[in-house]
Amino acid sequence: MSKHSLIENLKKQIEPIAEGLDYELYHIEFVKEGKENYLRIYIDSENGVSLEGCEKVSRAISELLDDIDPIQESYYLEVSSPGIDRVLYTDKHLEKYKSYNIVLNLYSPIDKKKKYEGELVDFNENEIDIKVEENIVTIPREKISKTTLKGEL
């Protein structure tokens, strides 16, 4: 099974578990770091994510994973909040954070810059518009390597 298929299959099964515990499934990734594999589950909630909440979701997901055994290799399960400087992966994430400050990292420079910071104004399937100082800058999505919420306390 490909990594993409694995993630999609896990999303379908983990999402109802997270929702049943009053959390949103924000993102899933399966990564290798050094010699170790990690299944990382990011959860979110309107009320924030506590350590106890992560533990509760982790136990429920762990039971599911023990039952369905979707990953043949050994791995560590990690459940956490996406954090204040969270990556915005989907249109749903972009919609939620319209009018917030974001950081766009680019694959290659546009106007000699590989990083743009500004207020998320709008987006569509092809572009993201951000307000930088008083100017609207339109960046093609294909040029963006990562979109991150600019965490501000």
UniProtKB/Swiss-Prot annotation:
GO terms for cellular component: cytosol. Keywords: Cytoplasm, Ribosome biogenesis. CDD domains: YlxS_C. One of its GO terms (biological process) is translation. It comes from the Bacteria. It is found in: Cytoplasm. The keyword Cytoplasm applies. InterPro entries: Ribosome_maturation_RimP, RimP_C, RimP_C_sf, RimP_N, RimP_N_sf. Its main location: cytoplasm. Required for maturation of 30S ribosomal subunits. Belongs to the RimP family. This is Ribosome maturation factor RimP. It comes from Clostridium botulinum (strain Kyoto / Type A2). The gene is rimP.
